[in-house]
């Protein structure tokens, strides 16, 4: 039973949002990490660098103990201080960096994850060194009500053109995961699905 549960999450990426957690965030993350998702992206964009670093140190340790990849979100200096070799970037942040900064990022990180919303974003991300793409928004979500999802055709179009793994985001759950994978995605990202598990 436990092996089956872990297997069903092997193509998922857990995106954190401690504001969705009822109870202790670290306890929730322990539960999530024990499910062995493909990776965790520690988002928590509202925290100061110092607060984020304190939290990241704990989450990175949990992930290391369980053999789960952990990406820090946009905090390159924090990642460098903590020895984390995985970073997740948004396209606007990536575009604001000069070529020298992007080159340094490619040297410092073994995996670079980038959020994309169009073919142009994907091309830019890959050119800048992305090793995986987080593609959204595929289905309508709770956190972005009213924003129409781009659908499975969009996933297929991007996956066909993209030389690196693509993970779909936006309204993804375990029932929809096979649909995005059939469209060519390597897997899917879940936020509320993991924060409320």
Positions of predicted regions on the chain:
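N-terminal amphipathic alpha-helix/helix-capping segment at the start of soluble metabolic enzymes
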Residues: 1-27, 92
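Glycine-rich phosphate-binding active-site loops on the catalytic face of alpha/beta enzymes
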Residues: 14, 90-99, 134-146, 172-197
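Catalytic beta/alpha-barrel core
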Residues: 15-18, 38-51, 60-99, 109-123, ...
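Generic hydrophobic/aromatic pocket-lining and core-packing "Φ" positions
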Residues: 29, 56, 60, 76, ...
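Active-site-adjacent loop and "lid" segments of alpha/beta metabolic enzymes
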Residues: 29, 145-148
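Acidic (Asp/Glu)-rich catalytic clusters
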Residues: 29-35, 64-65, 103-107, 126-127, ...
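Alpha-helix-loop-beta-strand connector modules within alpha/beta enzyme cores
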Residues: 53-72, 100-118, 148-173
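Catalytic cores of alpha/beta
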Residues: 70-85, 117-129, 161-162, 166-167, ...
């Amino acid at each position: 039973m436990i092996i089956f549960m872990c297997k069903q999450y092997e193509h998922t990426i857990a995106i954190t949002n401690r504001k969705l957690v009822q109870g202790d965030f670290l306890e929730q993350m322990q539960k999530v990490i024990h499910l062995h998702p493909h990776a965790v992206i520690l988002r928590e964009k509202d925290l100061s660098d110092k607060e984020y670093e304190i939290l990241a140190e704990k989450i990175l340790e949990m992930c290391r103990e369980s053999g789960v990849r952990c990406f820090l979100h946009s905090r390159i200096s924090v990642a460098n201080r903590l020895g984390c070799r995985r970073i997740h970037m948004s396209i606007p942040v990536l575009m604001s960096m000069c070529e020298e900064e992007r080159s340094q990022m490619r040297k410092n990180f073994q995996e670079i994850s980038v959020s994309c919303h169009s073919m142009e974003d994907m091309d830019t991300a890959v050119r800048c060194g992305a090793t995986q793409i987080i593609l959204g928004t595929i289905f309508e979500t709770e956190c972005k009500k009213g924003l129409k999802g781009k659908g499975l055709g969009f996933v297929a179009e991007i996956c066909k053109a993209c030389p690196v793994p693509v993970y779909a985001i936006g309204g993804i759950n375990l029932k929809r995961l096979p649909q995005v994978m059939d469209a060519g995605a390597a897997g899917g990202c879940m936020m509320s699905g993991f924060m409320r598990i």
